[in-house]
A protein has these predicted regions:
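Membrane-proximal helix-turn-helix segments that form the acceptor-binding/catalytic region
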Residues: 114-119, 146-166
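A charged, aromatic-enriched C-terminal amphipathic alpha-helix characteristic of glycosyltransferases
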Residues: 206, 359-402
């Protein structure tokens, strides 16, 4: 156990006593005390996280890595949303990591922090897992309004240019932010899933049984944010589902289409008629169990071809792999890791048929998906984050990060 309430981490317990006079056993031979503790505090990097949110993004990119680094004793990380202006708080800190900061007051804080970092010798990392420049945010995205103010763009850019490093989720986003900001120190840190959150819900026997029970009408499930749908009809439903809505309608009796979290407005009539299932979103804690209870035969993840979507991570693919469910993903660089991809609605239907028309083939794909997760559990990849908080950009000790990012 490490306590952060000092300039450097301290072990909050006393050295082992030389002997206990209340015991009947012979005491240990006395040793000469040197004044040094027999328990040396481990040399852990101390870091600070400043979150922009406590929802999915905050957990995937900040809170879960922080939790596991602390639990494994890999680092000593404190997180929160309050920006602290007492310089003594930053004594002994190696890294300050800030998530998606964009306002004028946040920019002023980062300017002060940047000056302090030179005095106290710590680095500042800007974490971003989405595109935040208005020209590349789709008009159907319900959160676009938050980035329409030119001042937000200006301050976001200024903050990213001040930071020593930017962390992103994929190669496309890496190149995007290098080009937009001029900051060359942009590092890809993929999304990883915590075992403690999602691992326990895989059950091969259940997946096989579900396949057999729904063989005549496979359950084709989509789980995702309402930001993928043109819910305000701004651009006549030309959203992430525009290119597949027709085939969903045509195959509504062949497949049991299931939507979780949102649905295309053009399919509202089929939902009202109960021909398509719709389920409300749930909280982050219950999410794995919730989507597992949808009894999916396959998952699918459509996206419009845009810079915004190319900068997305492969979350939907690895969520499917964690549950052992084959997942069919849009054929974009976003899902370069995916096993099954589609371009058009007809492609999607063909992939569904391919995966669901043979029990042995389906079982093989289930095991293949699950095997892939061996490389994407957060606990097994925590050293990516240990390196991130411990060493500066490009340092040879960043073996995992350098290998992934092509730094020799």
């Amino acid at each position: 156990m490490i306590t952060p309430f000092h300039h450097t981490p301290r072990l909050p317990f006393a050295p082992t006593p030389i002997g206990n006079p209340s015991l009947t056993l012979p005491p240990r031979p006395q040793q000469t005390m040197t004044g040094k503790s027999s328990h040396k505090a481990p040399d852990l990097p101390r870091g600070l996280n400043f979150y922009a949110d406590y929802s999915g993004c905050g957990h995937w990119r900040m809170i879960w890595p922080e939790l596991l680094l602390n639990c494994y004793g890999k680092a000593n990380i404190q997180g929160g949303t309050v920006m602290i202006g007492d310089k003594n708080f930053y004594q002994g800190v190696k890294t300050v990591r800030i998530q998606r900061q964009a306002t004028e007051s946040q920019a002023n804080y980062i300017k002060w922090l940047s000056q302090l970092s030179k005095e106290l010798n710590f680095k500042i990392i800007y974490e971003i897992d989405d595109i935040i420049f208005k020209e590349d945010i789709p008009h159907y995205n319900k959160f676009r309004f938050a980035f329409e103010d030119p001042k937000i763009r200006q301050t976001s850019m200024e903050i990213m240019q001040l930071c020593d490093e930017i962390t992103v989720t994929n190669k496309f986003m890496q190149n995007y932010y290098i080009e937009k900001t001029g900051n060359k120190n942009v590092t890809v840190v993929p999304n990883f899933i915590p075992k403690l959150w999602m691992d326990r819900y895989f059950d091969l026997a259940k997946v096989k049984d579900n396949y057999q029970r729904n063989k005549k009408r496979p359950r084709v499930v989509y789980c995702g944010s309402g930001a993928h749908f043109d819910i305000e009809n701004r651009i006549k439903q030309k959203d992430d589902f525009y290119h597949i809505n027709d085939v969903i309608r045509k195959t509504v009796d062949k497949f049991q289409w299931v939507f979780v979290g949102g649905f295309p407005l053009t399919l509202r009539d089929l939902i009202q008629q109960k021909k398509i299932e719709y389920h409300e979103w749930t909280n982050l804690v219950d999410y794995p169990e919730y989507i597992n209870r949808m009894n999916p035969t396959v998952f699918y993840a459509p996206l419009e071809d845009s810079n915004f979507n190319k900068a997305k991570s492969d979350l939907k693919f690895i969520e499917g792999c964690a549950l052992g469910i084959p997942t069919i993903c849009q054929d974009l660089c976003t899902y370069s890791t995916a096993f099954h991809k589609f371009k058009t609605g007809d492609d999607l239907v063909s992939k569904i048929e391919y995966l669901t028309n043979d029990y042995k083939k389906y079982t093989k794909e289930v095991k293949r998906a699950r095997d892939y997760m061996k490389s994407r559990w957060m606990e097994d990849n925590i050293n990516f984050y240990t390196e991130l908080y411990s060493f500066p950009y490009g340092d040879p000790k960043r073996k995992n990060l350098n290998r992934l990012n092509g730094i020799s």
